[in-house]
């Protein structure tokens, strides 16, 4: 450090400053790369002020005392220690760059210069936020709140006038960034004796250290603190009392001031001395320190002629050491921040359950538990306030910026929940997922996150009801989970239908206008000038037209640019609706007079079948989502080339509609553990998995020893196969364990039991013990275990136990599952008792996750489309071969010719059987799998063959669930969801 430190206080009186800064000026001051290098004469200070030269005289108000070298040795020691600690932190964390922010309201830059110099010596970065002197309290607080939520800033100090130091301003600071120790929380911890957990006022600490370094024994000394207020007064009193001193605080206008000054061994001035108080009231030999706010801010000098007391400590010593101790606090703040970024067990307040028997309805259970405020949950799991967007009290969106903040954090363990071929009633994968995370976090104290799909309102009002889990293992509030949530599906519907409208509108306009008229409307005159938009320039580049001036295109280029020449018979993009409506499966559009006879047959799909939903589920960033949306192929032109959303010029608008939907939704389980609900593609007509982004964020938040449990739709043959071959390819993530959910009910069905129909009471075979049916049906469980083993991932079977299941049936299933190759098989009782009922499953999953995964894909994406379809049909479904319809073969040829042959396959098939026939239970054999059609989701990144007759728009049953759904108009409570 050498000669630089003595230069800092060459002047205590500053020359007149230039006019105040603008309303807000942020001046970043990057730290120097080295430590010592002496200060050079004429070196420019912050904001263009010249530092004092070595030869400049010190102000006459600085009275002798100890030599500058002796004074600076204390500061040098503090700064050197801070520098060494920071260097060690950066050795282990090279990307760590601690930043101190200083909010300055005024034009006096003395303290600013001191802080800058010392920060440079220690290796810190400083950002100054310069505000005018007349800034209001509200303006100061606004700046504080911005810095509080800036993850790049690790410490915050205020350099403002004393009249702005209100409780409201001081307590606006985040305690963990309050390096001056002025907030009530830091002061409270200091008073309580937890100095190691808080920041101590650098000024108060400087006073103590200077006294002790000067050889003053504080034990038994009478300390008088005069004119101090607020945080400084409290900190001084607390620190002096810790040293055994008798401390008294007094104000300047107190009657007994003269006698108290006369009795004191040490006097600490907390505010400027009034002119009428003579210095002669202080006994010669008394140690005096000036800590007044005006002096520390450089606004006043030493005042009238001085008495040289025997134990005088120079005022500038307090300034300089306080600044050094602020740097020390700053380094401590950075160290604490790094520690917070490392894996730790969450300090999660779990909600207690009081299970009832018989188990009430799902909505009664949900309503009986009061959820935590979602901002509290977010803080518990390590999210920052600026990383969440709160919707009401119980749900929030999480911003993708958390991935950047935690990019160096190791991922947790990744668990997939799949199932055997289900009954139409479902076998409880969501319930198992939630029960498992409740067991891990609430009962085993392991960080865990559930990642679930958002349910479509179609099935919610149709046949299935809610999808928030069930019993004492569900997401709450379940009515918010099952209905609109945060509007993601509505955003998808709007974006999808905007694109559909753009397609038909473009066909109409191209069919009714000349090339020139079309071009002039696509590139209109604005203020006499034609300009291409950004997306139009991209289309020109795609067409090989290297021009940017609309007036320079030839007639041929104008025609090429203006006409997409869409072949209506090749349009694959359909309108969508989030309602089960069978009468929209085939419609005619364009029959109005204004459409001039340009009508065609079309259809509606369920909203979650939209390719935009698949894009949302597979994207990993906003930029990636925009690129995927632009690549979506909606049709072919009349020469057989693909037409994309980019060609239609609608990509930017789609991205705007989806910009909030890309953020995962945070909710909680009944026991207060975190859940991400994000994206909800169907598993039979899409890839059936929640979003990649939700999984990636959750894996960072749980830490290396934590668990993220996500669910794949329907049976392992559908949802799990697509999870591995599509989602894992897109995300680059590798699962550690598969949990395979089975029920005695479903196994009895596969063993030859009567058909199971939604809304119809179960036959006695399902409610009474029947060992033979269970044993025969375990063939389906064994097949699904074998499918899992194709991918090299250990599998744990979770038997979701119903109240009618017997011990003999349960034991038989677990035994046969282990014989089939399962790592373990565990009965689960979470539905009736919550996470406590899945503790054995949680332990089995932890043990399985400790084993090495030998994950592998089922096929190479570079092989031909037909071969990939055949591999899935034979290896997963057990088919003898496949049969392509002429239409399917033509589509495969077209997609291959267009360059899409290297995409993975997403089979659209019934979920009720391993085959294409829903009534074929167990393990069908020797069947030929018919491929009736093949479609492409180029933006999502897969080809999807349609197996047999697959509807992409469900219908309502005779008695839909909406018969039971109602609203209490007095309490506004939803009734009838189950």
Curated annotation (Swiss-Prot):
Task: Report biased composition (Gly residues) as residue ranges.
Answer: 33-45
Q: Where is this region: Methylenetetrahydrofolate dehydrogenase and cyclohydrolase?
A: 31-348
Example of a GO cellular component annotation carried by this entry: mitochondrion
| Residue numbers bearing the N6-acetyllysine modification | 189
Tissues/organs with expression: Detected in most tissues, highest expression found in placenta, thymus and brain. Low expression is found in liver and skeletal muscle. Up-regulated in colon adenocarcinoma.
Where does this protein act, in terms of pathway?
A: One-carbon metabolism; tetrahydrofolate interconversion
- Chain residue ranges for the region called Disordered: 1-71
UniProt-recorded Gene Ontology molecular function terms? ATP binding; formate-tetrahydrofolate ligase activity; methylenetetrahydrofolate dehydrogenase (NADP+) activity; protein homodimerization activity
Q: Where is this region: Formyltetrahydrofolate synthetase?
A: 349-978
Keyword Transit peptide: yes or no? yes
| Modified positions (N6-succinyllysine) in chain numbering | 189, 596
Q: Which HAMAP family match?
A: FTHFS
State the domain notes. Answer: This monofunctional enzyme consists of two major domains: an N-terminal inactive methylene-THF dehydrogenase and cyclohydrolase domain and an active larger formyl-THF synthetase C-terminal domain.
Q: What does this protein do?
A: May provide the missing metabolic reaction required to link the mitochondria and the cytoplasm in the mammalian model of one-carbon folate metabolism complementing thus the enzymatic activities of MTHFD2.
User: Of which family is this protein a member?
Assistant: In the N-terminal section; belongs to the tetrahydrofolate dehydrogenase/cyclohydrolase family. In the C-terminal section; belongs to the formate--tetrahydrofolate ligase family.
Q: Which PANTHER family match?
A: C-1-TETRAHYDROFOLATE SYNTHASE, CYTOPLASMIC-RELATED, MONOFUNCTIONAL C1-TETRAHYDROFOLATE SYNTHASE, MITOCHONDRIAL
Q: Give the protein's recorded name.
A: Monofunctional C1-tetrahydrofolate synthase, mitochondrial
Q: Which gene encodes it?
A: MTHFD1L
């Amino acid at each position: 450090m050498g000669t630089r430190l003595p230069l800092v206080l060459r002047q205590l009186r500053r020359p007149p400053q230039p006019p105040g800064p603008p309303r807000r000026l942020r001046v970043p001051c990057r730290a120097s790369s080295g430590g010592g290098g002496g200060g050079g004469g004429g070196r420019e200070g912050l904001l263009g002020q010249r530092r004092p030269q070595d030869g400049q005289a010190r102000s006459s108000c600085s009275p002798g005392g100890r030599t500058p070298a002796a004074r600076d040795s204390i500061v040098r020691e503090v700064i050197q220690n801070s520098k060494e600690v920071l260097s060690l932190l950066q050795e282990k964390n090279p990307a760590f760059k601690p930043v101190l922010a200083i909010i300055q309201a005024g034009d006096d830059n003395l303290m600013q210069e001191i802080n800058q110099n010392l920060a440079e010596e220690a290796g810190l970065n400083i950002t100054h936020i310069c505000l005018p002197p007349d800034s209001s309290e509200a303006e100061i607080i606004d700046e504080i709140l911005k810095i509080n939520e800036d993850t790049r800033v690790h410490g915050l100090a205020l350099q403002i006038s004393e009249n702005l130091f209100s409780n409201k301003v001081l307590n606006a600071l985040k305690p963990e960034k309050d390096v001056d120790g002025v907030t009530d929380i830091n002061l409270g911890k200091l008073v309580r004796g937890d100095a190691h957990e808080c920041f101590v006022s650098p000024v108060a600490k400087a006073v103590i250290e200077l006294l002790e370094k000067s050889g003053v024994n504080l034990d038994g000394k009478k300390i008088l603190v005069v004119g101090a207020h607020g945080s400084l007064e409290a900190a001084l009193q607390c620190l002096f009392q810790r040293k055994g001193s008798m401390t008294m605080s007094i104000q300047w206008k107190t009657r007994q001031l003269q006698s108290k000054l006369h009795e004191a061994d040490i006097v600490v001035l907390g505010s400027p001395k009034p002119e009428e108080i003579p210095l002669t009231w202080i006994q010669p030999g008394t140690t005096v320190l000036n800590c007044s706010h005006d002096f520390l801010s450089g606004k006043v000098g030493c005042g009238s002629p001085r008495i040289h007391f025997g134990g005088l400590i120079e005022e500038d010593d307090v300034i300089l050491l306080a600044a050094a101790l602020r740097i020390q606090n700053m380094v401590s703040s950075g160290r604490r921040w790094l520690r917070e970024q490392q894996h730790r067990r969450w300090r999660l307040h779990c909600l207690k359950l009081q299970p009832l028997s018989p188990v009430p309805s799902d909505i009664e259970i949900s309503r009986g538990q009061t959820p935590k405020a979602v901002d509290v949950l977010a803080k518990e799991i390590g999210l920052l306030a600026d990383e969440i967007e709160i919707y009401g009290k119980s749900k929030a969106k999480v911003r993708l910026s958390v991935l950047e903040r935690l990019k160096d954090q190791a991922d947790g363990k990744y668990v997939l929940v799949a199932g055997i071929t289900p009954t139409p009633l479902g076998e409880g994968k969501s319930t198992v997922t939630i029960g498992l995370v409740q067991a891990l976090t609430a009962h085993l104290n392991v960080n865990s996150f559930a990642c679930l799909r958002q349910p479509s309102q179609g099935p919610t009002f149709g046949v299935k009801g809610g999808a928030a889990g069930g019993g004492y293992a569900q997401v709450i509030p379940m009515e918010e989970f099952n209905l609109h949530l945060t509007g993601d599906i509505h955003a998808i519907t709007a974006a999808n239908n905007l694109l559909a409208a753009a397609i038909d509108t473009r066909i109409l306009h191209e069919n009714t206008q000349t090339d020139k008229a079309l071009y002039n409307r696509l590139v209109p005159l604005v203020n006499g000038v034609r300009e291409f938009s950004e997306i139009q320039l991209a289309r020109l580049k795609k067409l090989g037209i290297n021009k940017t001036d609309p007036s320079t295109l030839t007639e041929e280029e104008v025609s090429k640019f203006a006409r997409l020449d869409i072949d209506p018979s090749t349009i694959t993009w359909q309108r969508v609706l989030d309602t089960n409506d069978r009468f929209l499966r085939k419609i005619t559009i364009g029959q109005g007079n204004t459409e001039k006879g340009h009508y065609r047959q079309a259809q509606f799909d369920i909203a979650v079948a939209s390719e935009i939903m698949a894009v949302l589920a597979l994207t990993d960033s906003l930029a990636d989502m925009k690129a995927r949306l632009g690549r979506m192929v909606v049709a072919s032109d009349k020469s057989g080339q693909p037409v994309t959303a980019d060609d239609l010029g609608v990509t930017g608008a789609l991205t705007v509609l989806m910009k909030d939907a890309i953020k995962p939704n945070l909710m909680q389980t009944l026991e207060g553990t975190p859940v991400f609900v994000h994206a909800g593609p169907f598993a039979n007509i899409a890839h059936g998995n929640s979003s990649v982004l939700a999984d990636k964020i959750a894996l960072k938040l749980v830490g290396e020893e934590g668990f993220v449990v996500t669910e794949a739709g329907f049976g392992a043959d559908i949802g799990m196969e697509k999870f591995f071959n599509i989602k894992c390819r897109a995300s680059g993530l590798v699962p550690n364990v598969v949990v395979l959910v089975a029920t005695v009910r479903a196994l009895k069905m596969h063993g030859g039991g009567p058909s199971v129909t939604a809304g119809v009471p179960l036959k006695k075979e399902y409610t009474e013990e029947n060992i033979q049916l269970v044993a025969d049906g375990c063939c389906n469980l064994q097949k699904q275990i074998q499918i899992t083993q194709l991918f090299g991932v250990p599998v744990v079977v979770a038997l979701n136990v119903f109240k009618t299941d017997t011990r003999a049936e349960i034991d038989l299933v677990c035994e046969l599952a282990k014989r089939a190759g399962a790592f373990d098989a565990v009965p689960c009782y979470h539905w009736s008792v919550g996470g406590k009922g899945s503790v054995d499953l949680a332990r089995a999953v932890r043990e399985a996750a400790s084993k090495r995964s030998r994950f592998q894909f089922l096929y190479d994406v570079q092989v031909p489309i037909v071969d990939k379809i055949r591999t899935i049909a034979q290896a997963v479904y057990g088919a003898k071969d496949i049969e392509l319809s002429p239409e399917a073969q033509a589509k495969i040829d077209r997609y291959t010719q267009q360059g899409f042959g290297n995409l993975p396959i997403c089979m659209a098939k019934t979920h009720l059987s391993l085959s294409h026939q829903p009534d074929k239970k167990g393990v069908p054999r020797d069947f030929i799998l018919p491929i009736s059609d093949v479609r492409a989701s180029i933006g999502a990144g897969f080809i999807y063959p349609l197996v047999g007759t697959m509807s992409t728009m469900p219908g309502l049953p005779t008695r839909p669930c909406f018969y039971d759904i109602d609203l209490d108009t007095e309490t506004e409570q939803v009734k009838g969801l189950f």
